[in-house]
């Protein structure tokens, strides 16, 4: 947490960190600007309540087993607990075994909540367990998915690990 705090002060940027138990929210909120709720914890009321009770932005990653419509319940819980600002992240939906797919209409549905929507193109190409003994992915699909997402209008597209991709995607728009 000290490193996150140092980075945000030195570079004047917002920092983000996951929390995994409700008790981490208060401590993490002193050192970061955005508390992120991991996908598999995204329906846990105690996690949402703890994150909302801070002054941080709360970013919730949509679990692969949830529909876009289910995120309305998440947003309503966060609003009930007076979250300062809420972001939602689309990361793909489970499609059979070893496959995630992206339903772009889901981003439009989530935008109806009034919250900014982030599209995580790198997670969306993941193939959980797809290598037999480990997870794999299809990097060649990251750029086309990100470009398609930009045309559908998510508010943010994080492009971690892919140097220069944002420039290429935007130049093709």
Language-model segments: residues:
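C-terminal helical cap(s) of enzyme catalytic domains, especially alpha/beta-barrels
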Residues: 156-173
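Catalytic alpha/beta core domains of metabolic enzymes, predominantly
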Residues: 43-160
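Conserved residues at beta->alpha junctions
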Residues: 19, 39, 62
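Conserved hydrophobic residues forming the short capping helix/wall of the S-adenosyl-L-methionine
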Residues: 8, 75-78, 173
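Short, flexible loop segments at the rims of nucleotide/cofactor-binding pockets, characterized by
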Residues: 12-15, 36-38, 94-97, 134-135
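N-terminal active-site wall of soluble small-molecule enzyme domains
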Residues: 1-36, 44-47
């Amino acid at each position: 947490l000290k490193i996150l705090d140092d980075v945000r002060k030195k570079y004047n940027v917002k920092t983000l960190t996951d929390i995994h138990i409700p008790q981490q929210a208060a401590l993490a909120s002193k050192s970061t600007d955005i508390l992120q709720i991991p996908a598999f914890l995204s329906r846990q009321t105690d996690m949402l309540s703890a994150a909302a009770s801070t002054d941080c932005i709360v970013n919730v990653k949509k679990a692969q087993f949830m529909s876009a419509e289910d995120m309305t319940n998440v947003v309503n819980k966060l609003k009930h607990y007076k979250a300062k600002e809420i972001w939602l992240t689309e990361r793909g939906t489970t499609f059979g075994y070893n496959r995630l797919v992206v339903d772009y209409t889901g981003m439009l549905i989530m935008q109806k909540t009034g919250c900014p929507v982030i599209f995580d193109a790198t997670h969306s190409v993941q193939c959980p367990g797809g290598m037999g003994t480990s997870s794999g992915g299809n990097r060649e699909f990251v750029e086309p998915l990100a470009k398609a997402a930009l045309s559908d209008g998510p508010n943010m597209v994080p492009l971690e690990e892919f140097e220069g991709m944002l420039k290429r995607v935007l130049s093709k728009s």
